């Protein structure tokens, strides 16, 4: 849990319109690709309301998770070591993964964020962080670098994911952090990082969002995040072939005062798409009955409050769209109402956490 919190903190970023998603450096053969861009001016993250919401959430979470109290200290430690402001609305990421037949993942992440390369190098050297090599580019061992930034991140580094190694295969390379310039960092195993770095230098063709997917992405208003899945680049399976699944695109965007999400799945034919559309619409139709619960079983006030929040979330889900070989789920929530719903969920969780028996002190 601590590792996930810390990694989320380190990679916190938001996004720009779809035409400004920067995929340069992302290998075109990745099965799953994602990107974000600057959040500057977005109500969801770069507004007085968003900042006030974030402050309230940090205070609430700190009351139930002691390690959360150190988030500001971690941010300051990272800024002192790298010059990077994790809360800058101009931070962006792009990357992706490919999956092997045995289920092993390979991929990388490009972080586009202003930082001080000299300061980062001096810090890594002073902390004696191990080095790795991606072609002609030197980098640092990612786990060791993370551990060197702060005591809390050092604890998280113990849970750092180790690259999987197939039985009988040579030991896998560690994940490295490669600093290309004051605006670009690459996180990947050395061999993959070398490939990404070459693409960033213009040596080869990077991934490009398919033109057929742009209407779905742009339909969210001002898109600020996108994830694309290409089934043809996933390991083949009889189940996937029979389903006719070709791929999917997920996008989040801001349209006026609303947050809009679209998730579209594509199939080889209208007939192959129909089962998913029917199942999804059926689940939505059953939602009110599921929320009503069993009248013979009394609900606590907390449970009633949570069901009301879930009802508000579901109310933002639009009817399933089935058009030809495409099935689309659209959600729309008013931004301030969304903040309120999330705040209520956290508050209920905090109340339950405080009421739960505490582990005995050792």
Predicted regions, residues:
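Structural boundary/hinge residues at secondary-structure and domain interfaces
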Residues: 19-167, 171, 217-240, 276-314, ...
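Helix-loop elements that line ligand-binding/catalytic pockets
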Residues: 244-273
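Sec-dependent N-terminal signal peptides
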Residues: 3-14
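An acidic-aromatic pocket/loop used at catalytic or ligand-binding sites
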Residues: 169-191, 313, 321-326, 338-339, ...
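A conserved glycine-rich beta-strand in the N-terminal activation segment of trypsin-fold
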Residues: 167-242
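Short cationic amphipathic helices and targeting signals
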Residues: 32-34, 103-113, 183-188, 261-266, ...
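Helix N-cap motif at beta-to-alpha junctions
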Residues: 113-117, 190-193, 268-272, 332-336
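Short amphipathic beta-strand and strand-loop transition segments with alternating hydrophobic
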Residues: 92-101, 248-254, 315-322
